[in-house]
Amino acid sequence: MNKKKIIIDCDPGIDDSLAIMLALKSEELEVKGITIVSGNVHAKKGAENALKILKELGRLDIPVYIGDGEPLVRELITAEDTHGCDGLGETYLPKVEKANYKDGAVDFILNSLREEDELSIIAIGPLTNIAKALNKDKETTRKMKELILMGGAFKSFGNCSQVAEFNFWVDPHGAEKVFNELNRKITMVGLDVTRKIVLTPNYIEMLKQFKNPLADLIVKITRFYVDFHWEQERTLGCVINDPLAIAYFIDSSICSGKEYYVDIVTEGKAIGMSLVDEGDFYRKEPNCLVLTEVDAKAFMEMFLTRLLPEHKKDIFNILNNSKYGN
């Protein structure tokens, strides 16, 4: 099998951690490295969390590189209220002692693009590292095969303001630079589709019943997330945004959308808003495939069966039994 080569650029983060799990459990993908950006938590904490997840999966062979830690212009705002003080739902998993992250996320991205053909980036945090790569070496950054990003909103309302999704809101200038300068079609896996990906109480109860170490870890790190979603949105369960970007990259039939020109608001009350030019007001060539529809059941089947293949039969039974109301 010819594996798809990727770098995961992320800010772990509960759902980032679930996305890393899915990527590493998918034989179609070859994860060349994980680069860390500040977002859900500061980059240093995010790097420590990435190592914790890699250790749990027995994949400390994958290098972790940390970015500069600050957005291009705006002061950093993190989301410990959503992800817990440690970024992993206040589980306080033990620090990894036998491995460490390295500095130089931007250089790692650029060197990897110079050395590897057909390398894609899946960016599930703020776009600071990608923007700084463009600042440093635009020609090399444009060599990436695809940029799949979790961020933005089109028809959906925002999750940190009425109109802005968190990743673009944290570093709107970085997002603006990427959309305007990358010169590659971007795929925007935004809130229009990710809001439909909910780890429901039924799924969580199923995971508990498996008595499986990885299932137990998922339950453990999402408990805080579940409480947050109930308190803030009256959602039962938790929305897991980031794994959908991985799933779509593996199987694009899971989502559908349309190409548009997209720009990002960098100031004012709408800061971080993704402006999707549905009416062709700007008369510019599309720079982004904006996903608007998702087969949530197909996603959940992929996500759960890949992470827990030994429980595939039970997972299929739950997914296909309407009485569970998933």
For each of these PLM feature ranges, what is it?
Residues I77-G84, S161-E165, Y203-E205:
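Short, surface-exposed amphipathic charged segments that create phosphate/polyanion-binding patches used
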Residues N2-C10, I14-K52, Y92-R195, P201:
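Active-site histidine-anchored catalytic micro-motif
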Residues K3-C10, P63-G69, L88-G89, N129-N135, ...:
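Short, mixed-charge, low-aromatic patches
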Residues V64, V178, I246:
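A residue-level signal for conserved active-site and pocket-lining positions in enzyme catalytic cores
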Residues V41-K45, L72-V73, A153-F157, D263-D280:
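Short, mixed-charge aromatic SLiMs
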Residues N2-K3, L22-A23, E30-V31, W169-H173, ...:
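Conformational coupling and interaction surfaces
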Residues K55-L60, G69, L93, R114, ...:
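Generic secondary-structure signature for well-ordered alpha-helical cores
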Residues K4, A47-E115, N287-F299, L304-L308, ...:
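Metal-dependent C-N hydrolase catalytic cores
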